[in-house]
Amino acid sequence: MMEGFPSHLAERTRHRNSVAAPHGSGPVVVWLKSSFRLHENPAIDLGRHIAAEHSLPLLIYHGIDERYPHASLRHHTMLLDAAVDMDEGCRKAGLRYVLHVARDGHRPSVMKAFSQSASCIITDLFPLPPWTNWVDSIAASSTCPVFDVDCHCVIPMPLFGKSVDRPYKFRDATKKMRKKRLQATWPTIDARPEPYTGPLPFEPVNVNEDIKNLSKRFELLSKCSIDPSVLPEI
């Protein structure tokens, strides 16, 4: 399946399980954990490519969990600020973006459900626990292909790997690769897949009503199991 990916996306992508082709007619789900931007986002671009190539609907899923290290009111607030930008950007681009915030009364296993209903899952590569463990678990149980994509590094992690053990060795070994990529314009993906409009395994947060409104935002945050003593910066 990866042989059909655009080269600038293929070099950033890892196939995380043995499922070789999209499964069923469910959505292509782009699961965002750290790369909360629409512009030059390889995970979203790959999702658009796969969805269009296979005539499948596309869904951009942003889940904010309480279980990451040092989860706090400050960090959650920054994540919700990013959600506002993502919601507006995806709407303008004709993409379906949905936000889930884990909190009292709202803690379903969203990705576990998507692992059985999605046609394909793409996520941004974030090689630290607990996120690596979550991706491993979803990839192992999923009925569809699961890919993770490096959305952060100039030299893609899947391309170079771990063959050096010192920063200066890495700089020397990748000098030409880095120069080539820094000078290049990020290719545009013109694919326009249909947005997914079907049922979801959770109730999405209404970003416009419940996140942009700061009173409602902090009411929602009060239901999250996070450290409330680390306050947002003003």
What are these regions, as identified by a protein language model?
Residues 30, 60-62, 148:
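Structural beta-sheet core signal
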Residues 102-173:
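Active-site neighborhoods of enzyme catalytic cores
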Residues 23-24, 163-234:
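Glycine/tryptophan-enriched, flexible segments
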Residues 27, 55-59, 145:
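Residues at the starts of beta-strands that form the adenosine-phosphate
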Residues 38, 46-59, 66-122, 126-133:
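N-terminal Rossmann-like or analogous alpha/beta NTP/dinucleotide-binding catalytic cores
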